[in-house]
Amino acid sequence: MKCLLLALGLSLMCGNQATDIPQTMQDLDLQEVAGRWHSVAMVASDISLLDSESVPLRVYVEELRPTPEGNLEIILREGANHACVERNIVAQKTEDPAVFTVNYQGERKISVLDTDYAHYMFFCVGPPLPSAEHGMVCQYLARTQKVDEEVMEKFSRALQPLPGRVQIVQDPSGGQERCGF
């Protein structure tokens, strides 16, 4: 009986630590998401994932390119040694058309939550797999640098399930040396 209670208590504790990715899209047309994008807003389940320009998950997506194999090449900029560095990452397709895996700071899952293809896309990057640790970063991408308040509201609603989220809204008119702008 003591072992059963201990197992139940541990499973409840671990369940509270997990961070679930909000619902993903049913279908995703890779050809439609291809092209230039701008990181407009970032949200994290833990502030330490975004609290400086050089943290590994604070990246600025610039372009998405579908590959002939059905994968997705992601061109991004990130802070490194007080400079912006461009990187290309290939996200591998999975059975779910809106979910990819990527080897970036460990193997991670990228889930596309929503897109209208012409104006916005929301996605989340989960913690390294397999992992019980929490730590998810989500982004609102837009085809232009202009923040659409309606879409920002929709982004916020899509992320309601994330515990302790922190939102950072980028200033597109801000400094030129900031990565992505």
Swiss-Prot record:
GO terms for molecular function: retinol binding. PROSITE patterns: LIPOCALIN. Gene3D superfamilies: 2.40.128.20. Residues 1-18 form the signal peptide. It holds the Pfam family Lipocalin. Keywords: Disulfide bond, Milk protein, Retinol-binding, Secreted, Signal, Transport. InterPro entries: Blactoglobulin, Calycin, Lipocalin, Lipocalin_CS, Lipocln_cytosolic_FA-bd_dom. It is found in: Secreted. Disulfide bonds join 84-179, 124-138. GO terms for cellular component: extracellular region. Its main location: secreted. It comes from the Eukaryota. Belongs to the calycin superfamily. Lipocalin family. Monomer. Lactoglobulin is the primary component of whey, it binds retinol and is probably involved in the transport of that molecule. This is Beta-lactoglobulin-2.
